[in-house]
Amino acid sequence: MIVCAEMDEHWGYVGAKSRQRWLFYAYDRIRRTVVAHVFGERTLATLERLLSLLSAFEVVVWMTDGWPLYESRLKGKLHVISKRYTQRIERHNLNLRQHLARLGRKSLSFSKSVELHDKVIGHYLNIKHYQ
């Protein structure tokens, strides 16, 4: 059971900034760890994939930013929309940018293939959160 889960999306790119790649993930506010993540476009389909991974957990309270798809998809659940209550996951986004140069906004380091981009970030999350 997860008492409080923060959900957010993190922007990245592959090859050129026009080829966007989004990391959607959920962060357990109490345990301070990433619970699940998926890569894809910033669409409802990617959000649905993340929520299907999270269906195994019983999440009591969802905390998200103001992206409208969160509100429409989490209707009927205890859902808090606030920047104040997503500060931990936003801090984690900053940590990702600091630890992985390819996620920096203005960097000479960038991913050249989608497969490698997903594997490097997935491996980092696996080492830091899933083990």
Curated annotation (Swiss-Prot):
Coiled coil location: none
Role of this protein: Absolutely required for transposition of IS1.
Underlying gene: insB1
Residues spanning the signal sequence: none
Alphabetical GO biological process terms: DNA transposition
Family per similarity comment: Belongs to the transposase 27 family.
InterPro entries xrefs: Transposase_27, Transposase_27_IS1
GO molecular function: DNA binding; transposase activity
Stretches that traverse the bilayer: none
Protein's name according to its UniProt entry: Insertion element IS1 protein InsB
Keywords: DNA recombination, Transposable element, Transposition
Pfam families: DDE_Tnp_IS1
Keyword Protein biosynthesis: no
